[in-house]
């Protein structure tokens, strides 16, 4: 049986460690798409920091876990954000806890057929149940490499690609280098060869962008950094070129995750 979320591209920006800008990239890419009239659902799956909710200055009183347990419509847990065309769904529990629910709950996401994109913001690790589930539910994922911690970040990206592509049947759509300095073309080409992916965007280290999380500011909408805006536009162009995935065997993927974690 097909459990896919109708007429949506489901995407995760993945990264191996926290504090490297994954949430900022997710929110700004969503804002850029929303500005073009696309409808976006952001799933804040990071229970610990609630990063997307913080950045967008949104507070949820009803969570996905609540509506599943109480058998309420999923839309009851979705809240508006200050940005037109962007809505947010907070999970309320660790993503790992959702593996204990009946797989048939995924059918209820058919209610959400009016979005163009779903972005899942999961905890920042290259392994673990939360990462596996976010990748498993995503049609595509984009590894984000932190240039200021390049060695661990590159290894994390390699791990994520191996698991996401070969085990969880999600497709890597390219990679992003974040907090970069000026990079020789030879270095970028080496990374392409190692990961087997194209480079979508190189976002240079910028204190204005890094401080935007604390300030709860979406830099793309303020146009306060033209280079950053240009790089987000490159990401959006790549996302718009991705083909819609017609069918995925999500129950099979979920079972793989359960088996690997002994749940």
UniProtKB/Swiss-Prot annotation:
GO terms for molecular function: ATP binding; ATP hydrolysis activity. ATP binds at residues 16-23. It comes from the Archaea. GO terms for cellular component: cytoplasmic side of plasma membrane; cytosol. Keywords: ATP-binding, Nucleotide-binding. This is Uncharacterized ATP-binding protein MJ0924. Pfam families: AAA_31 (PF13614). To M.jannaschii MJ0547 and MJ0169. The keyword Cell division does not apply. InterPro entries: AAA_dom, P-loop_NTPase, ParA/MinD_ATPase.
């Amino acid at each position: 049986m097909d459990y896919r979320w109708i007429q949506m591209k489901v995407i995760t920006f993945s990264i191996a460690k926290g504090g490297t800008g994954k949430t900022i990239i997710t929110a700004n890419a969503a804002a850029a798409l929303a500005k073009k009239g696309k409808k976006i659902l952001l799933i804040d799956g990071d229970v610990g920091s609630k990063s997307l909710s913080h950045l967008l200055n949104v507070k949820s009183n009803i969570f996905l876990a609540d509506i599943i347990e109480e058998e309420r419509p999923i839309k009851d847990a979705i809240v508006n954000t200050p940005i037109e065309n962007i809505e947010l769904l907070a999970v309320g529990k660790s993503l790992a806890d959702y593996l204990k629910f009946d797989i048939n709950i995924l059918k209820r996401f058919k209610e959400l057929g009016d979005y163009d994109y779903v972005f899942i913001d999961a905890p920042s690790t290259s392994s673990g149940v939360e990462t596996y589930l976010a990748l498993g539910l995503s049609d595509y994922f984009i590894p984000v490499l932190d240039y200021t911690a390049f060695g661990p970040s590159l290894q994390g990206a390699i791990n994520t690609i191996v698991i996401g592509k070969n085990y969880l049947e999600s497709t890597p759509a390219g990679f992003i280098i974040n907090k970069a300095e000026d990079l020789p073309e030879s270095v970028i080409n080496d990374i392409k060869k190692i990961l087997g992916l194209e480079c979508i965007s190189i976002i240079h280290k910028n204190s204005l962008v890094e401080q935007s999380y604390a300030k709860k500011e979406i830099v793309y909408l303020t146009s306060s950094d033209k280079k950053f805006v240009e790089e987000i536009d490159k990401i959006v162009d790549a996302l718009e070129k991705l083909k819609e995935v017609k069918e995925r065997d999500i129950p099979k993927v979920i079972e793989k995750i359960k088996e690997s974690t002994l749940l």
